[in-house]
Curated annotation (Swiss-Prot):
Keywords: Ribonucleoprotein, Ribosomal protein, RNA-binding, rRNA-binding. The gene is rplF. This is Large ribosomal subunit protein uL6. One of its GO terms (cellular component) is cytosolic large ribosomal subunit. Pfam families: Ribosomal_L6.
């Protein structure tokens, strides 16, 4: 039995979960999210208001999907109640970010500003010219947008310049030694 998969998913008040076969829809104060669970996994509502995720057999695929499916359902519930936020920061002389309407515009040392459009369900907030955050109810989408932004200018291992997650430790390299 999966250590994560066997834990029941608690559904807080104000959250409505509907299950239709393999489709799970979660409605909460922040919005609605839907997910299709992979075939061997079965999800059911319990009498005490929790959700149980079970697998029919001990095949390798079923074991692999058991804990994953439970965590994905938990992420839906957390998303519609609390939401997800990734805080990011920019290091480097002249590197900055600005909010243009709902979108972000970066100055990252290129000959042109780099715009990033806010997809549906994602909001950007700029705290200072070097600190910003990506927020939304879908954990996967927030993480993917954050990774795409980081990819614009990855942190340099020699000077540490670039876009990074808040608190991320960059492995620094020693430069060439002079004569």
């Amino acid at each position: 039995m999966s250590r994560i998969g066997k834990i029941p998913v608690t559904v807080p008040g104000g959250v409505d979960v509907s299950i239709d076969g393999q489709d799970v829809t979660v409605k909460g104060p922040k919005g609605t999210l839907a997910l299709t669970i992979s075939e061997p996994i079965v999800i059911a509502k319990n009498d005490d208001g929790t959700l149980s995720v079970t697998r029919p057999d001990d095949e390798r695929r079923s074991r692999a999907l058991h804990g994953l499916s439970r965590t994905l359902v938990q992420n839906l519930i957390t998303g519609v109640t609390d939401g997800y936020t990734t805080k990011m920061e920019i290091h480097g002389v002249g590197y900055r970010v600005a909010l243009k309407g709902k979108d972000l515009e970066f100055a990252l040392g290129y000959s042109h500003p780099v715009p990033i459009e806010a997809p549906e369900g994602i909001t950007f907030a700029v705290e200072s010219p070097t600190k910003f955050s990506v927020s939304g109810i879908d954990k996967q989408k927030v993480g993917q947008i954050s990774a795409n932004i980081r990819r614009l200018r990855r942190p340099d291992p020699y000077k540490g310049k670039g876009v990074r997650y808040e608190g991320e430790q960059i492995r620094r390299k020693v430069g060439k030694t002079g004569k």
